[in-house]
Amino acid sequence: MGAKTGLLVYADGDVPGLLRRVGAADLDRTATMMRQLYPGREIEQREGSNLGDGVYPPEGTVCAASWPGVEVIGDQEVMIDAPSRLPEHLVAASTGRRLVLHAMHSVVDWLAFAVWEDGRLVRSLSLSPDSGIIENIGEPLPFELPYWAGDRPADIIPWPGEEEEPYALPFHPLELGEDALRALCGFIQEGRPEPDDVDADAIELYGFHVRDPYGPGPAEQEAKLRRAVEDTDPPRFYALSPDGSLVERDGL
């Protein structure tokens, strides 16, 4: 699975229903929202994206759109281990409406989602196989129940040379993550789409470069990235064998 999200949605009601009815977002309205949600930051418009891709924009980029009744923000900064610690000003902006946070990263099988109603946290879950359950606040939502009941166990293929071991969680976080994204926002990243899913690729988001004026500059960030790449081991490639196991191979 290659799904990654860092998503906030503010809404006056049911998010999927509202997103099904949106048209082109107003740029001035969206820019005003950005200034409210990113106080003290330098904000510069750049190339946008669609909702399907904009839920995980490049670092330092925010993809966003504001319509009457619903606002969408895609930003890696909201991918936090404990959703209950979302910055207070972001939660305060949800007064009188619903706020949904959805974040997942396929590399580490991590999922986090949360729901606030009128500024009050009603549900938060964050978990990964390496860290276990990081946060679990409130009662499980209906789409979660089959997972906690053991009806959706993780189906994991072991790496070559490793014995199959029980998965560290009773279900796969990314599978729950897709169901959470559909239930809370109306669309998915991976998997089989359903007829009434929101067409995320048809919803356009504006792009913004967001920078802390007191943070590292572009040259320093590029140097840091270059050092990280140099320290990374070369990639290894695997393919499925006829018996369903993984076999290492040379290159793609």
Residue spans for each PLM region:
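Short, intrinsically disordered low-complexity segments
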Residues: 29-126
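Short, extreme N-terminal segment that most often corresponds to the first beta-strand
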Residues: 1-33, 249-252
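Short loop/turn segments at secondary-structure transitions that flank enzyme active sites
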Residues: 14-16, 79, 130-131
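Surface-exposed polar/charged interaction patches
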Residues: 25, 96, 187-191
